[in-house]
Each structure stands twice: as C-alpha cells, then as structure tokens.
Amino acid sequence: LGNHEYDYRSKGLANMLEAAKASGETVPALVVCNVDWDSIEQDGLNDGQKQIRSAFEAYGVKDYVVVQKGDVKAAVVGVFGKDALECAPTCELKFKDPVEAVKQTVEEIRKNEKVDMIACVSHGGTWEDENKSEDEILAKEVPDIDLIISGHTHSELKEAIQHGNTYIVSCGEYGRNLGSLSMTQKQDGRWELTSYELIPVSEDVKPDRATQEQIDALMDTVDKNYLADFGYTREEVLAENDVEFNSLEEMGTKHEELNLGDIMSDAYIYAVENSEYYDGDPVDVAVVPSGTVRDTYTKGDITVEDVFNSFSLGIGKDGVAGYPLISAYLTGKELKLVAEVDASVSDFMTTARLYCSGLNFAYNPHRMILNKVTDCYLTRADGERIEIQDDKLYHVVTDLYTGQMLGSVMKMSYGLLSLEPKDRDGNPIENLEDQAIMEDDRELKAWDAIARYMQSFADTDGDGIANVPEYYETTHGRKVVEDSRNIIDLVKQPNKFSAMIAGICLIFIVIIVLVVFLIRRMIRRIKVRKGKRNSK
C-alpha cells in the first residue's frame, strides 16, 4: 500500500479492495506489516477504520506471504513508510515504526517459515541523503532482508543499492519501467545480485490483446459514467500545444519557477473567476503543489485525458473522483509563510514544492532555514507589484489536497510554523472540505479548472481549436533564486525565525562557555589542592 491509496479516503480504499475481491478474478497478494491495529482498537475504531479493517479481512491483507517459485521459497513482507504517511492527509490508520515492524515480522518469518529468501516491498523510498533514506535505513537495521523493492520516492535506480547482503532496487514512476533482476544463492545461504536492468515500457511493447480489450471497455465506462457529467469525452482536444513544458521529474529536482506550475495555478484563478457561479470576490493567489501533479503536457494536441491524467488524484466530499478547488483566506503574514514553506521546507518534502499565481517571491538557498525568502509580493494580470499587508486578509484558491498537506507541514514544524485558513470574515475554518467551490450542487474539480483554461485560449491558427499561448514558453519572476553567499545577503532582513534560531545558538554557546569555565575552575582547584599536599 502507498499513500495515494488513501486519496479516495477510507471508503474509497475499502471499495477498491471489495470490488477486486468480488470480481471473482485472481487478485494479487496485498502485504503491509505495520498497521497499528492495537493502538487503533484502544482508541476505538471510527467508521472509516472499520471500513478498512473489514475490507482488509475480506481481501486477505497479510503482514507477509510465502511464495514458492521452482525450488525457491521466498517470504515477501510489505511496509508503509514514514514519509508516505506524511503525504497521506486523509489516511485514518495509525502505523508502527516501519523498521521495528519489519524487524519483528522478519523474526516471525525466521521462527515459523523455512524460507530461502526474504524480500520486502516497501513504500518508504530512497533519498540522496543516505541518513534519511528510509529503505537504506531499513536495509541496515534489518540485515536479514535479501531484497527491498522500493517505492514512494519514484527513484529510478539504474544500479542496485547494496548494504551488507541486502539489495535495494527501484524502477521509477507510473509503470514506465519494468524491473528485471536475477539473484544466485551463495554457499552461506545469502543471495548475490547477478543481473539487474530497467526495461522501458514504451509503445514498442506490443499490448496483450485481451488486456487491451478490457482497458478499452473500461475507458468507454469512463466516458459514459464520469466525463459525460462534465461535458467532455476522453479524446476531446482542448488545445494545441507548441510549448515545451517542464517534465514531472523536474518538479522534484528543480527548486525554481516552472511553466507547468504556472499554467496550472493560472487555471485555478481563471476557472473560479469565470464560473457562472462566481460571487465577484477576486482571487489574490492560487497555489499548486508538486505533490498533486501527475503528468506534464507534451507538444501536440492536449486532450481531456491528458489534463485529467495530469491532476487525477483524490475525491471530494461529493464522492466524485478528483480533488475540488477550495476557497480560503490567509493574512499577508501567512502568505509570506507560504513562500517560506516552499523555500525552506520543500527540499526536505518535495511534495510541498509550491507554484503560485498572484504571489511572487525571491529566496536565497544559502540563508538560514525559515529565513530564506528575501522578497515577497502580489502581482496582478498586468504585472503590477502590490506590497503585502501583514494583517490584511487575502483570497486564496487551491485544491483540497494542498490545504490538507499544508496542515501536515504545519504539524511537522511542532508549532514553529502557523497557518490557519479562514473564511472571508476571518473566522478559522473547521473543515476544509466545506470550503469546496461549488457550482450549484457540483464541486469545481481541479482538473476541470485546467481543462476550462485550456479551452479558453485564443485560436491563433484559425483551425477552430485553442492554442497554448507563447506566454508559457518562459518564466515570469514568480519564484526567483538568489544564489548568493555574500555575507550581507545571508544576514539581511532577519525574521522572527532567524532571531529564534540565533537565540538558541547563543544560549547553546553560553552553556558551552560556562561548562568550559567550570571545568577549568575545577581543574585549577584540584591542582591547588595537590600542590598544598605536596608542600606538606
């Protein structure tokens, strides 16, 4: 299981599992060893937790399974990672520490099963920093694991990572590669990786006829039972595109303004202000995080399917697939904090990398954490700069996931960061779901907002189809990186966070000085006493 299994909430996950089981077809084993049912039961199960437990039992979810392939008997254990949980704001389950849960499960396997190999399917992931890389930590802490098949971080490992006798492999994102590996058992019973490759899943791969027929039938169902309600068909062309949009990978690797984020955030404002149900309250800022974006737009025709695939996650309170746009108000001080979340937090949590329309800022990556932003202001469509007033309320539009995710980021800061969405009167919002932008009795979905924006572009070549404007061929100073190590640039414009951190450092230094002073004083006293004894 991964974090996006919870995008459709507990009921959605339960429905998926129950539908799969009820299909009568052979379903794959589902393994996850660190759901903390004991803790959940102590607190009393809510309705969502009851639904998931019932679905888990009906499907047959286990901590691990034993698979016999030829002469080899292997145990496969599954685990849900820490960062995955942070990225699942709608998940109602509690989880044990991944390492401890896997360690306990492996001990159980060793005790009760006579297996030749232990493999772990992990939604923990790998990072560049080995000390924070969840699956590398797992490999070191649970050395009895022979193979970790790693997910979550979309890492495309061209070569396996090895720690001791444990290998970690990962084939990237969205089924674009098929991982293939071979292992040979050594005399001591452990396994050696003898071959490993990532095979691209491209159009060159001939589709299986029966599978393709089933996919086509399901696609027809999507048209009839879902897209028709929005007035679209799957293959309908929304716009023609000659712009080279940033790749999805770049949203995770580049910490700067990207045109893919620009067009999506602009779409939010357009859709709200051009809805027939628009209440006339101008949108000041729209925010899109990288964590919700699932695909880019290639050159050529952009279809409804392309747009839906680019923002396909989630579900609204209405029970219809797709995250809705929500409307809320933040103070100017909180808007500046939004910029600081991107500048300071998103390198540790790339799903929190933010792309804004209406909010421009500059940051220096070399400055103190939580004080990296050096300039922050609003802009209008004509590019006019508008200074932010700290105590003024500003109208912000984003998708439901973003609102929930920013709440998770605030929790992770242990009170250092405080951002409280409000209604237009300044009252705190109790439930973000209630802030969904409605068109009569229907939620305005984020993907639909993008589709409408695409359709709104001018038809510049006269063929009756909109064209993506040249505006998106370049960036527009929405997120400026000031790569300076100049001492003045590093310390100018200190905020409360830098003062707080500086104060903590000063206290730490004072404590060290006092400790050193006391130790030296004690040493001098001891020497004086010894001297007096010797003189006697």
List each language-model region with its residue ranges.
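Acidic, metal/ion-coordinating pockets
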Residues: L1-D204, M264-A267, Y329, S346, ...
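Catalytic centers of hydrolytic enzymes
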Residues: C87-L93, G172-K536
